[in-house]
């Protein structure tokens, strides 16, 4: 999904440009994801607010973000803009988000193998500095956050 430093700096640029727009509209910018599949790319912006996000909220943010993107033109290729709530399978982007969801089940995919594997599914134990602590069966892994390509909460229904 991500192609190393180039995509990482592109994400930082998009975050710096778009997060203030989302916040100014009264929403939390939960995270931004930019993925390329061949000739087509997708820019996903996850928004959140107290009480949840409705379709109308996504439309409001999408219109404002589209205007900023049209003026600033930070993406040189063709892309689709998607604005949504993080949903039940909430993606995790920051060390603070990982810390706040300690105790939840997570699915994590790394950019490159760590201890012989790229995929981890288990209990999110918390964070230690810039490492995410995940327990998979009887083994605990400290995964450097900068190695994480994608992470999501696995919803449980009690």
Curated annotation (Swiss-Prot):
It holds the Pfam family RimP_N. GO terms for cellular component: cytosol. Its main location: cytoplasm. The keyword Chaperone does not apply. The keyword Transmembrane helix does not apply. One of its GO terms (biological process) is ribosomal small subunit assembly. It is found in: Cytoplasm. Keywords: Cytoplasm, Ribosome biogenesis. Required for maturation of 30S ribosomal subunits. Belongs to the RimP family. This is Ribosome maturation factor RimP. It comes from Pseudomonas syringae pv. syringae (strain B728a). The gene is rimP.
């Amino acid at each position: 999904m991500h192609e190393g430093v180039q995509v990482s700096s592109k994400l930082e640029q998009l975050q710096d440009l778009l997060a203030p727009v989302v916040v100014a509209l009264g929403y939390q910018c939960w995270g931004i994801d930019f993925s390329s599949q061949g000739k087509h790319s997708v820019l996903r912006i996850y928004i959140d607010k107290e009480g949840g996000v409705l379709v109308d909220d996504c439309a409001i943010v999408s219109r404002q973000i589209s205007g900023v993107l049209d003026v600033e033109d930070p993406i040189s290729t063709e892309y689709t803009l998607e604005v949504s709530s993080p949903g039940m399978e909430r993606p995790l982007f920051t060390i603070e988000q990982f810390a706040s969801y300690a105790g939840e089940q997570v699915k994590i995919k790394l950019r490159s193998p760590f201890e012989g594997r790229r995929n981890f599914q288990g209990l999110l134990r918390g964070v230690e500095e810039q490492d995410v602590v995940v327990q998979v069966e009887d083994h605990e892994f400290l995964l450097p956050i900068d190695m994480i390509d994608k992470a999501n909460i696995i919803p449980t229904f009690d």
